[in-house]
Curated annotation (Swiss-Prot):
Family membership: Belongs to the cytochrome P450 family.
Entry's EC annotation: 1.14.14.1
Cross-referenced PANTHER family: CYTOCHROME P450 2C9 (PTHR24300:SF400), CYTOCHROME P450 508A4-RELATED (PTHR24300)
Protein's name according to its UniProt entry: Cytochrome P450 2C2
GO cellular component: endoplasmic reticulum membrane
Described function: Cytochromes P450 are a group of heme-thiolate monooxygenases. In liver microsomes, this enzyme is involved in an NADPH-dependent electron transport pathway. It oxidizes a variety of structurally unrelated compounds, including steroids, fatty acids, and xenobiotics. In the epoxidation of arachidonic acid it generates only 14,15- and 11,12-cis-epoxyeicosatrienoic acids.
Top-rank lineage group of the source organism: Eukaryota
Subcellular location(s) per record: Endoplasmic reticulum membrane; Microsome membrane
Gene3D superfamilies for the chain: Cytochrome P450 (1.10.630.10)
Membrane-crossing residue ranges in chain numbering: none
Organism name: Oryctolagus cuniculus
Enzyme class, first EC level, given as a word: oxidoreductase
Cofactor section: heme
Length: 490
């Protein structure tokens, strides 16, 4: 009898993968590795470098294939043509967000990153318009970034060319830009509220980038019933939302609907305009989560790019020299960089683009979800299926970028030395779900890096050839190793 039970269990295990595929919404999913019962393909994937695992699978199954993260199928799209087709040509059909991601559970469907449907459409449209139009009749966002760039330079000057870890300073600058846009005012770098906020965002960034949280994404039951670092992330989010709630209350007391001071004011005015609409998406809960989203997305990603960028520049002092020569020729020493300078600085512009391309910050994009049954190439993908697009396969395409694993600003220059645009440049994703803060992030990266190199030459503590550029972690986001640098005044 025991032998019969064992054989029955073994047979069930063998049949279960095919039953999964046949029963999932009647669709015809792309091929992929055979999943194990319950676990799916998680044992065949390296969550410390998921991008590499998916690239290896694409060599076997082609540009579109299926992996099972637990019992949930995820369609993986690899290579420029397939990614463009998915995110641009089928942008509407693939505009959903998974409800099973840990971050989606934390946000409860609110905000601008993990919301869906009407709420996402209206919140995204409002956020884009507010960020784009912000500064009309007031200080522009560019002026706020320039002010922060000046403060950043002064903080670096205080190091007196001594070796330092730049992590905090390079995190404080983009965080303060967001504070200026959201709360009207920037903070001093020693302000305790500011330090606490930065600490919570930084800790959550590490937690959400950990293999454990990626594992929780595969098995959502772990999030609800098991201990782990995700519990700390929940506490941190409560802390941040409590702080934002107090800021909102202060804004409500002094709100002038004819003179909005910042993002919160604009949202509160929109709430007032729609107060008679019981179906309005402009609520306090949505404001809280949207502000949290803007902070999380607009601080850590820009900070990490700046840190990784400086590390690469230290490894390539010849690039620093060329950028500084261009800065001297176009800007000089007696004024701050501005965005109008960028069109006259092709090498600097190319360097900023190459930093983003090379570091491949978010290799696999944030997962999309089909909002309807979808025919994609020769496959039928059911509504509610997660789709993972490999941005890494686009940014490191060897046809568009010869020697893609080499850091070379020439990837974005033509034969005459002019800046060359590329459709393959999509570190912010592309299509309907492209990053809301793309324009702000591009501005910050150009102005911050240009201001730093206008005033300093970053020097490593080792020979440039020995600078370690390998990522400290390659989870959802690629994070550079910790390092020390000397900022030598120019």
């Amino acid at each position: 009898m025991d032998l019969v039970v064992v054989l029955g269990l073994c047979l069930s295990c063998l049949l279960l993968p095919s039953l999964w595929k046949q029963s999932h919404g009647g669709g015809k999913l792309p091929p992929g590795p055979t999943p194990f019962p319950i676990l799916g393909n998680v044992l065949q994937l390296d969550f410390k470098d998921l991008s590499k695992s998916l690239t290896n699978l694409s060599k076997v199954y082609g540009p579109v294939f299926t992996v099972y993260l637990g019992m949930k199928p995820t369609v993986v799209v690899h290579g420029y043509e397939a990614v463009k087709e998915a995110l641009v040509d089928l942008g509407h059909e693939l505009s959903g967000r998974s409800r099973f991601l840990v971050t989606a559970k934390l946000n409860k469907g609110f905000g601008v990153i993990f919301s869906n449907g009407k709420r996402w459409t209206e919140t995204r449209r409002f956020s884009l318009m507010t960020l784009r139009n912000f500064g009309m009749g007031k200080r522009s966002i560019e002026e706020r970034v320039q002010e922060e760039a000046h403060c950043l330079v002064e903080e670096l000057r205080k190091t007196n060319a001594s070796p330092c870890d730049p992590t905090f300073i390079l995190g404080a600058a983009p965080c303060n830009v967001i504070c200026s846009v959201i709360f009207q005012n920037r903070f001093d770098y020693t302000d305790q509220d500011f330090l606490s906020l930065m600490g919570k965002f930084n800790e959550n960034f590490k937690i959400l980038n950990s293999p454990w949280v990626q594992f929780c994404n595969c098995f959502p039951i772990l999030f609800d019933y098991f201990p782990g670092s995700h519990r700390k992330a929940v506490k941190n989010i409560f802390y941040v939302k409590n702080y934002i709630t107090e800021q909102i209350k202060e804004h409500q007391k002094s709100l002038d609907i004819n003179n909005p001071r910042d993002f919160i004011d604009c949202f509160l005015i929109k709430m007032e305009q729609e107060k008679c609409n019981q179906q309005s998406e402009f609520t306090i809960e949505n404001l809280l989560t949207t502000v949290s989203d803007v902070f999380m997305a607009g601080t850590e990603t820009t900070s990490t790019t700046l840190r990784y960028g400086l590390l690469l520049l230290m490894k390539h002092p010849e690039v620093i020299a060329k950028v500084q020569e261009e800065i001297e020729r176009v800007i000089g020493r007696h004024r701050s960089p501005c965005m109008q300078d960028r069109s006259r600085m092709p090498y600097t512009d190319a360097t900023v683009h190459e930093i983003q391309r090379y570091i491949n910050l978010i290799p696999n994009n944030v997962p999309h979800t089909t909002i309807c049954n979808l025919k994609f190439r020769n496959y039928l993908i059911p509504k509610g299926t997660d789709v993972l697009t490999s941005l890494s396969s686009v940014l490191h395409d060897d046809k568009e970028f010869p020697n893609p694993d080499r850091f070379d600003p020439g990837h974005f220059l033509d034969a005459s030395g002019n800046f060359r645009k590329s459709d393959y440049f999509m570190p912010f994703s592309t299509g309907k779900r492209v990053c809301v803060g793309e324009a702000l992030a591009r501005m910050e990266l150009f102005l911050f890096l240009t201001a730093i190199l206008q005033n300093f030459t970053p020097k490593p503590l080792v020979n440039p050839n020995n600078v370690d550029e390998n990522p400290f972690s390659s989870g959802i986001v690629r994070v550079p190793p910790l390092y020390r640098v000397s900022f030598i005044p120019v």
